Amino acid sequence: PAKQVDSARTGEIGLVAMPALDQVWAFLKTHDTLRRDGGHNVFLYHHPDNRDDPMQIDFGVEVAQPFTAQDGIECIETPAGEAARTLYVGPYSQMHPAHQAIHSWCRENSRRIGGMSWEVYGDWTEDEFKLETEIFYLLAT
C-alpha cells in the first residue's frame, strides 16, 4: 500500500489515521496509474518490543503497482510469511475482541506472533454493523 508513516499509542490511532489517509488519497488522486479499483485502506502496525512504547503505524491504501517514494508518500508491502487471519464484521470501535481471538488462537496452537500486524478495511457502508475488516498477524517462524 501507499503510506504515510506515523507513530501512536493504541488509544490515539483514530487521531492520526484520518489526516494520514487524507494525504495518501490526495496523492493517489494525482497519480491515476497507481489507483487500484477497490483499493482499500490498510493499517500496518509495527509492534514495539516494549508494549508501553508508541507503535509505528503505516497508514496506506492498496495500489495497482509499486512506485518510487514522492511527495512524502512511500510504497511499502505488507510482510510476506505465514499469518493468522480473521474477518471482523461490525463497528470499528468494537474490533478489539477479534484481535484477542487471534491472540487466543496463537496461544492454543503454540504459535508466536511476529513483529507486525495489519488491518485491511473493506468497502464503506453507513451501517457500521456491516463494516468488514480483515485482521492479520504475522506469525513468528
Where are these regions (language model features)?
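A solvent-exposed interaction/effector surface
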Residues: 1-141
